Curated annotation (Swiss-Prot):
It is an enzyme of class 2 (transferase). Keywords: Cytoplasm, Methyltransferase, rRNA processing, S-adenosyl-L-methionine, Transferase. It comes from Cupriavidus pinatubonensis (strain JMP 134 / LMG 1197). The lineage of its organism: Bacteria, Pseudomonadati, Pseudomonadota, Betaproteobacteria, Burkholderiales. The keyword Transferase applies. This is Ribosomal RNA large subunit methyltransferase H.
Length: 159
């Protein structure tokens, strides 16, 4: 099973890449985390938020099209479901049991296109706070590693 993070944005600071890579490399080979970046669309007087999100959605769709048909879609959204660490660990176990990959979608500055959110099987909220998009990558990778560590009774998660 592969966990694919599809994130709008590129040219992140080095500390973002370092943080993400640290948690990605900790994952076991049978549960890899892969990052696929999508070029953001620039907002302008002729490019309103809806147009920006639609164009970014087309790029995200191209990435999703390269994944398996059984790929589950999880959209990160401020109105999504809150998971505790233990609940996320249980969800990760369920996804592994069901098979197929999981794609986590991180939108751009204007968020994810509503059509993408409608296609998602799960809407996930990482925090009630507004977070920088680069930090969301690191936080998501860390939480996926933490969830996996719970399923393995690994000492990383000590709650």
């Amino acid at each position: 099973m592969q966990l694919v993070i599809v994130a709008v944005g590129h040219k992140m600071p080095g500390w973002i890449e370092t943080g993400f890579n640290e948690y990605a490399k900790r994952m076991p080979p049978e549960l890899r985390i892969e990052l696929r970046e999508v070029k953001p669309e620039t907002r302008s007087s002729s490019n309103n938020a809806a147009t920006v999100m639609q164009r970014e959605a087309a790029r995200i769709d191209a990435v999703l099209g390269s994944l398996s048909r059984q790929c589950r879609i999880v959209a990160l959204d401020e109105r999504g479901r809150d998971f505790t660490t233990v609940q996320l660990a249980g969800q990760l176990t369920d996804w592994q049991r069901e098979g197929g990959d999981v794609a986590f979608l991180i939108g751009g500055a204007d968020g994810l296109d509503p059509a993408l959110k409608a296609r998602a099987q799960t809407l996930l909220r990482l925090s009630s706070l507004t977070l920088p998009h680069g930090m969301v990558r690191v936080l998501l990778a860390e939480q996926l590693y933490r969830a996996w560590s719970v399923t393995q009774n690994h000492p990383y998660h000590r709650a």
